[in-house]
Every structure is written in structure tokens, then in C-alpha cells.
Amino acid sequence: MIRAGVVLFGADGIAVIERIRDGLTYYVLPGGQVDPGETLAEAARRETYEELGLHVRIHGAVAVVNFRETTQHYFLAEAIGGEFGTGAGPEMDSPVDSERGSYRALWLPPHRYGELKPKPIGATLAAVPDPEAVVTGWLAAPLGFDEV
């Protein structure tokens, strides 16, 4: 499966989806499956609107993460419209006790970047003084990670 998502910084941190499933709470970058006929960037824009309620400009690829049978492509994005937290994709109405668990858009503050999944991206951003500058640097040479 191929997925596309975004790294989106704001005044309060990085945009994430808080997932609560099977009693666990975790934070993932916005994104989802690439639909037939979509480019990776188109899928990243669509998923960002569905999950966050924001229209974004894609600045370029910053990371590719291989996880199990999935390749996840992440793009640096900039919000250009919409209202954060108004995403209306089908998953956004999923209750905590459902098989899929719940989804909620929020800004993860910098001191919590280490909790972010994919873990290689979260760990890298947590370890540097200027995460946004580091991610911008990845535009020149997107990182590749295998997450276990």
C-alpha cells in the first residue's frame, strides 16, 4: 500500500492526528492511502483537508518511511486556507470504542515531538533545536527510514 502525508508546522507545534485505539493513545502525521489516479502530492493535499480541514501548498518531499507492507511519502506543507480541526473525512467521526478507534486533529507542542509517529521522524525532530529548519533541509535530500 502507498500512503501520502504532510509535515505541517504552526505556531503551536506540528499538526497531528491523535489516535486512541485499543486503550492506546498515539500521534501520527496527517495522511492516508493514495487513491487510483492520484499523485502523491494530490493525495497528501486531499488527506490533509479530510483530516485537518486545511488546504495546503506542498513544498516538496521530505521523507519516505517503509513500515510493514506500506510505503509512506511525507511532504513539507504550508496551510493556505481552511479552518484547523474541521476535517470531515469518514474516519474523523469514528468513536473511541470502534474497531478503528478515534481520530482528532491537534497541534503537538515541540516538547512532545518524541511521541510522534513515524518514530524515526518524531525522534529526529525531538533531538534538534530547530525542527522546522531541519525538515526544510530535507527538501534537498528526502530522508528514507525503515520503521520497525
Regions found by a protein language model. Name each.
Residues 53-93:
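Active-site segment of metal-dependent pyrophosphate-handling enzymes
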Residues 34, 79, 110-113:
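Hydrophobic pocket-lining residues within nucleotide cofactor-binding pockets
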Residues 8, 76-78, 106-109:
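Short, well-ordered beta-strand micro-motif
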Residues 11-13, 21-23, 67-69:
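Short strand-connecting beta-turns/loops that link adjacent beta-strands
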Residues 24-27, 85-148:
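Nudix hydrolase/Nudix homology domain
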Residues 3-5, 70-74, 102-105:
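Short hydrophobic/aromatic beta-strand or adjacent loop that forms the aromatic wall/cage
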Residues 1-15, 33-36:
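Conserved N-terminal beta-strand and adjoining loop/helix that marks the start
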Residues 29-61:
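The catalytic Nudix box helix
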